[in-house]
């Protein structure tokens, strides 16, 4: 068979599969864990690069947070009541680690393997009580698969009280380096 015909036939099979994943969208309505004045919305949109890599753009808008930088992470369970129900950072796969192991039992679950969790995002900078960011990651997907946010128990977005220092203090893990206490949480829901 001619190489051009092979290419066209392969494209007819591959491109619809890529296009099917492109355009998926999700949303999360965030509420303060202990302060009802804290509210926000996260919009997530999946797109596929020309190389076929799935990326998710996260747009976050928050109100009512104290000024300064706040860690933002995608957590492994789609539950926010209480905020601790969201579990650890989203980190599926054979090398994933969202829970403490016996050698590190003095560290919080979210600090283990940090900043290499799939759900680790950038810090949110809040000024005059308002913070926004737009961040694209290829560490998670909305479509089904190993990195999907929509596994059996879903996922949530959590905003923390402190900035994420990415636990990179001279290659040593320090308690709280992943952002400290949970300030706000929202369950991620697929909308398209």
What residues fall within each predicted segment?
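Bacterial N-terminal signal peptides
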Residues: 8-16
């Amino acid at each position: 068979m001619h190489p051009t015909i092979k290419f066209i036939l392969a494209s007819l099979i591959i491109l619809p599969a890529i296009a099917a994943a492109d355009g998926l969208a999700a949303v999360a309505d965030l509420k303060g864990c202990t302060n009802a004045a804290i509210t926000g919305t996260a919009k997530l949109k999946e797109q596929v690069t020309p190389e076929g890599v799935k990326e998710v753009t996260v747009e976050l808008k928050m109100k009512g947070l104290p000024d300064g930088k706040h860690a933002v992470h995608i957590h492994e369970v789609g539950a926010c009541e209480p905020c601790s129900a969201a579990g650890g950072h989203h980190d599926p796969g054979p090398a994933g680690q969202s829970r403490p192991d016996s050698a590190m039992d003095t560290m919080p679950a979210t600090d283990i393997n940090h900043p290499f969790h799939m759900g680790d995002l950038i810090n949110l900078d809040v000024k005059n009580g308002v913070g926004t960011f737009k961040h694209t990651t290829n560490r998670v997907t909305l479509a089904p698969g190993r990195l999907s946010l929509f596994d059996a128990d879903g996922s949530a977005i959590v905003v923390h009280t402190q900035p994420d220092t990415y636990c990179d203090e001279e290659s040593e893990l320090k308690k709280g380096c992943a952002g400290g206490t949970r300030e706000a949480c929202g369950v991620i829901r697929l909308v398209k």
